[in-house]
Regions:
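Chalcogenol-based redox active-site neighborhoods
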Residues: 1-130
Length: 130
C-alpha cells in the first residue's frame, strides 16, 4: 500500500490513468507516449510520472516491466476506490471488464490538482501544459 501523501506531498506529479493494463489501446497508444517522453516531461519540472489503472499492483508491475516503463511509477487502484473518489469511473461491465477508470491525466502540485484532462490525456496534451 502507498498513500496519496507519499505520492503527491511536496512534489509535482503527472498522474495518468487508463482503463486497464495490457489492453490494446492502453498498451499500443497511451502508455508508450509517456514512456518515450518521460525525460522531456521530467525536464519540465515533473518529479514523478505515475500510471494508474483499476488493476492490482502485481499486474501493474508486470505491465510496466513488459513496456520498459522504468521511469514511471505504476499504481494499481485495486478496488477502484481512488478512481471513484475522483468521480472518474468507467462502467465496463458490458464488456466483462467491471468498473474501471476513464482515461485521464492530471497535474498535481503538492497535493493540489492544477490541471485535469479527461480524453484527451496523451503525453503530448499534458506536455503542452507544462
Amino acid at each position: 500500500n502507498i498513500s496519496t501523501d507519499e505520492i503527491f506531498a511536496g512534489k509535482k506529479v503527472l498522474l495518468f490513468a487508463v482503463p486497464g493494463a495490457f489492453t490494446p489501446g492502453c498498451t499500443l497508444t497511451h502508455l508508450p507516449g509517456y514512456v518515450v517522453n518521460a525525460d522531456k516531461i521530467k525536464a519540465k519540472g515533473v518529479d514523478t510520472i505515475a500510471c494508474m489503472a483499476v488493476n492490482d499492483a502485481f499486474v501493474m508491475d508486470a505491465w510496466g516491466k513488459s513496456q520498459n516503463a522504468e521511469e514511471l511509477l505504476m499504481l494499481g487502484d485495486g478496488n477502484g476506490d481512488f478512481t471513484a473518489a475522483l468521480g472518474l469511473e468507467l462502467d465496463g461491465t458490458g464488456f466483462g471488464l467491471g468498473k474501471r477508470s476513464q482515461r485521464f491525466a492530471m497535474l498535481v502540485d503538492d497535493g493540489t490538482v492544477t490541471h485535469l484532462n479527461v480524453e484527451p490525456s496523451s503525453a503530448d496534451s499534458m506536455m503542452a501544459l507544462l
